[in-house]
A protein has these predicted regions:
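Alpha-helical structural context detector biased toward long hydrophobic helices
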Residues: 3-32, 36-343
Length: 343
């Protein structure tokens, strides 16, 4: 089956190794899997004087925004925040102290360079321009976030995106199903319960992530084709970067990793980039619904995506923060525990 050929864990036959070096997954001991990358969360940390591994953000439970606010605003350590044990595990290496095959190494390719990319955005002149490679790098990680966040797999935006990818992916193979079925079931059932998955649904979700990132299934990968297709037509898409350089006026990020405003013709998807920046991806509905048809092609050359950079537009920030609160699942996070810094 297609999936079997693509699903190379490590010891592969020589002809396959030559053809598909990128299809390899490397065993590693990482078991705490973040669905919003630590590097993204650290851009919202408040205790910058400690080393990056020990930084914290404030967690605002949604009950804080009720008519009668309840619950505590807690400082949480990023290393353990928005992460789940073995969320992206495909299989454990037998008898090898905690080594496992998971999607972490593939994810980390998209996470490296995030901090530098954020720094580069601070240097852009305000006004209209073309998006630089750093902004595309950030956007790609945010799109990956839509697809890998277990809280959002039932959101309509994510279901539409997954649907576009699914038309190109093979059916989940029996081999893949058996791998997931062989994982310790009490741990798996904890994930199913926490994120409202069925076992077949969770298995398909992992298979989709594997299939879209693997360069053994498609080369360039289906994910690379998706991000290229998104930005391929400058008439159908634009980016708006909002920056707040003056300090103490912050942007939330939601546990869902995005917020959405939609009307009949346009989707506006908002992403926190840092405590003092957020990004809006505006895309026409017609282009969004046509994405699936663009994925069979090899991506076009580097996109010429229109970008507008705007500074200190606080009304936009308030709207963004309110949407984050309204569309989060359990909590929003930020650099401060003072409401006036956000609203």
């Amino acid at each position: 089956t297609t999936m079997r050929k693509a699903f190379i864990l490590s010891e592969c036959e020589p002809p396959e190794c030559d053809e598909k070096p990128y299809a390899l997954l490397v065993a590693n001991p990482t078991k705490g899997h973040h669905f919003i990358a630590q590097t993204e969360q650290r851009q919202n940390a408040f205790n910058l004087q400690v080393n990056p591994q020990n930084r914290n953000v404030y967690q605002w439970p949604l009950s804080r925004f009720d008519h009668h606010p309840r619950g505590e605003i807690n400082s949480v350590n990023i290393e353990k925040n928005l992460e789940v044990n073995n969320l992206y595990t495909l299989t454990f290496v037998e008898g090898d102290g905690g080594q496992q095959y998971n999607l972490e190494t593939w994810f980390s390719r998209h996470e490296t360079g995030y901090e530098e990319a954020c720094e580069s955005l601070k240097l852009l002149a305000p006004g209209k321009q073309l998006a630089n490679p750093e902004l595309h790098r950030i956007l790609n990680l945010k799109i990956l976030g839509l697809l890998r966040n277990p809280l959002t797999h039932r959101d309509y935006l994510v279901r539409e995106l997954t649907g576009a990818l699914n038309r190109h992916l093979p059916q989940t193979g029996t081999e893949f199903r058996e791998l997931i079925a062989r994982r310790p079931q009490e741990r798996v059932s904890r994930i199913l319960k926490e994120f409202d998955f069925t076992l077949p649904g969770y298995t398909d979700w992992l298979a989709d992530l594997y299939g879209m990132l693997s360069e053994g299934v498609f080369r360039p990968s289906l994910f690379a084709r998706l991000t290229a297709a998104l930005t391929t037509d400058p008439n159908q898409i634009r980016l708006i970067l909002h920056r707040y350089p003056r300090g103490h006026r912050y942007c939330f990020f939601a546990d869902s990793g995005y917020c959405l405003q939609a009307d009949n013709t346009m989707l506006s998807i908002g992403f926190n980039i840092a405590a003092d920046m957020f990004l809006i991806l505006q895309i026409t509905r017609s282009h969004w619904h046509n994405l699936s048809n663009l994925l069979s092609e090899t991506p076009p050359p580097a996109p010429q995506t229109p970008l507008t950079v705007m500074d200190n537009q606080h009304q936009q920030r308030l709207t963004f923060n309110r949407l984050c609160i309204r569309q989060a699942h359990h909590a929003v996070y930020g650099k401060s525990n003072q409401l006036s810094d956000f609203l």
